[in-house]
Amino acid sequence: MSDELDSYRAKHYNSDDPIVRLLEEKIESLTKELEKLRQDLNWYKGELEKLLAPPYIEAIVLDILPDGKVIVRSSSGPNLIVNVSSNIDIKKLKPGSLVALTQRGSTIVEVLPEREDAYVKSFEVIEKPNVHYSDIGGLNEQINEIREVIELPLKNPELFKEIGIDPPKGVLLYGPPGTGKTLLAKAVATESNATFIQVVASEFAQKFVGEGARIVREVFELARRKAPSIVFIDEIDAIGAKRVDMGTSGEREIQRTLMQLLAEIDGFKPLDNVKIIAATNRLDILDPALLRPGRFDRLIEVPLPNFEGRKEIFRIYLQKMKTDGNIRYDILASMTEGFSGAEIKNVCTEAGYIAIRNGRKYVNMTDLITAIEKIKAKNNKAKNTDRTEKYV
């Protein structure tokens, strides 16, 4: 039959016939369409299987038995002794591993990747802070100290190994508000090219029992994975105040969180690529356990700027602004005795507003003096209010 068909084609087939060419093109088009429909059908079959398949149960490996079975703690409740699927390498299983179990046979069919808490992950600063040492005025001594303690061990650990000393694990920055403690930490992170993990200590104080300690533990696990890294804990007095026996559940939870923090600090080797910086305005209320050798070894005071420091801070901020060129930095520094770096920044910002109100596109000396007087009046009013409330 096939020979007869081939013979018929040989006699009657004419490839130059336009009708034949049209039919060939049509057949080719239909063949391609059929292939695409088959692919779509296979895709829909796969999706249907996924929709109908029962979900897996998440579990944590507790122990591996000699006979190859595994003890797991199921997310649904009880501890189970389960088998391991043949396509799973049992060497990959270890206590603490996350695995997936089938619902019916409770067999381990997949090893899950380590899970990162989204709340903890949000502490990591993805983009490096755009703050450099040149942006900080009046703190040259503090900059040199923090570079020796944080930056040098991260960049040149071999120096410490060769001499045979251990660099400090952590640095505690203390001083009045607005003196540049956070700026120092950001500048170190920028200059050392380390992952910067910033957290306010009050975020460790959680509502539920054990939650704060868990977050502390996971923050330091994140720091180890992202090493070299710097963990910056701002306002550490929120959880690091001296422990007192008040008996309230909230106080006990804060104490548990503090003990977890101390345990994590003690767990680091000095030359690990993880450094800790903490900042506080209240050194006097911190628990002595935080300040003992081996934890926050180096205490760096960040005081209010002196005369030369205030001049330098004014130069840093005013060089970014448009001025008339007749700025007397010595006069500005003498008028702002007792001002912090943050207050000097407020003076420059207020001077800019005064210039805008007066219809100018630049700042002059008069604007700055007016701004200083305004900030002083505001500070005096706040002090008088505090004094009045104290004796009411």
From Swiss-Prot:
Species this protein is from: Sulfurisphaera tokodaii (strain DSM 16993 / JCM 10545 / NBRC 100140 / 7) (Sulfolobus tokodaii)
Function (record text): ATPase which is responsible for recognizing, binding, unfolding and translocation of substrate proteins into the archaeal 20S proteasome core particle. Is essential for opening the gate of the 20S proteasome via an interaction with its C-terminus, thereby allowing substrate entry and access to the site of proteolysis. Thus, the C-termini of the proteasomal ATPase function like a 'key in a lock' to induce gate opening and therefore regulate proteolysis.
Keyword match Nucleotide-binding: yes
Domain comment as written in the entry: Consists of three main regions, an N-terminal coiled-coil domain that may assist in substrate recognition, an interdomain involved in PAN hexamerization, and a C-terminal ATPase domain of the AAA type.
PANTHER family in the cross-refs: 26S PROTEASOME REGULATORY SUBUNIT
Lineage: Archaea, Thermoproteota, Thermoprotei, Sulfolobales, Sulfolobaceae
Name the record gives this protein: Proteasome-activating nucleotidase
Coiled-coil intervals, chain numbering: 19-53
UniProt KW keywords: ATP-binding, Chaperone, Coiled coil, Cytoplasm, Nucleotide-binding, Proteasome
Residues in the signal sequence: none
UniProt cross-references to PROSITE patterns, sorted A to Z: AAA (PS00674)
Region (Docks into pockets in the proteasome alpha-ring to cause gate opening): 390-392
GO molecular function terms listed in the Swiss-Prot or TrEMBL record: ATP binding; ATP hydrolysis activity
Binding-site residues for ATP, renumbered to this chain: 178-183, 317
GO cellular component, one term: cytoplasm
Record-level GO BP terms: proteasomal protein catabolic process; protein unfolding
InterPro entries in the cross-refs: 26S_Proteasome_ATPase, AAA+_ATPase, AAA_lid_3, ATPase_AAA_core, ATPase_AAA_CS, NA-bd_OB-fold, Nucleotidase_PAN, P-loop_NTPase
